[in-house]
Regions:
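N-terminal secretory signal peptides that target proteins for export/translocation
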Residues: 1-2
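Amphipathic alpha-helical polymerization modules
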Residues: 18-165
Length: 165
């Protein structure tokens, strides 16, 4: 928390020429920078986990059961929630759960497959590569937006620290 003290000191020096700026307002500015960094990093972590789940779905998109009675891989879906963080007095993004998609499996006629039932049908995962690809692009763009936001917050912190010199 020495970082917060330094930022508060810099803001105090920076705003010392402005009589109408209070210490509380300076503290809010320092806390806002910390909150921005925490919000961005939580978003990056959440999107990173989302990309991991998507990549697992893609990697297992053709994994069938070994026998007719065994189900194939089931697509996983990640869910998020905003969680209050009292340290920064705001909400951050967290993974609330990862659940299996309960939609139907794809059936293909492959009578010679070891997992074929008595009709020759094989159950394939309920993974749609197009959906996973679109989701991964969205997750990557959201991750990149959080990186940009984090870089801006760090740049602002560095500018404040430069003012102390």
């Amino acid at each position: 928390m020495i970082y917060n003290v330094l930022i508060t000191m810099v803001l105090t020096l920076f705003f010392s020429n402005f009589n109408n700026i209070s210490f509380a307002e300076e503290r809010i500015a320092a806390d806002s920078l910390e909150a921005s960094i925490k919000i961005s990093s939580s978003g990056m972590q959440a999107q990173s986990q989302r990309l991991k789940v998507i990549s697992q779905n893609i990697a297992n998109s053709n994994v069938t059961g070994k026998t007719p009675n065994e189900n194939p891989y089931r697509r996983r879906i990640i869910f998020f929630q905003n969680v209050y963080d009292p340290k920064i007095d705001t909400k951050i993004l967290k993974v609330s759960s990862i659940q299996e998609d309960q939609s139907e499996f794809t059936l293909k006629y492959e009578p010679n497959h070891p997992a074929a039932d008595n009709r020759g049908m094989v159950k394939y995962p309920n993974v749609n590569i197009i959906i996973e690809t679109v989701d991964s692009k969205e997750a990557q763009r959201t991750f990149d937006a959080n990186v940009n936001s984090l870089e801006i917050a760090k740049t602002n912190q560095n500018k404040i620290l430069e003012l102390m010199r």
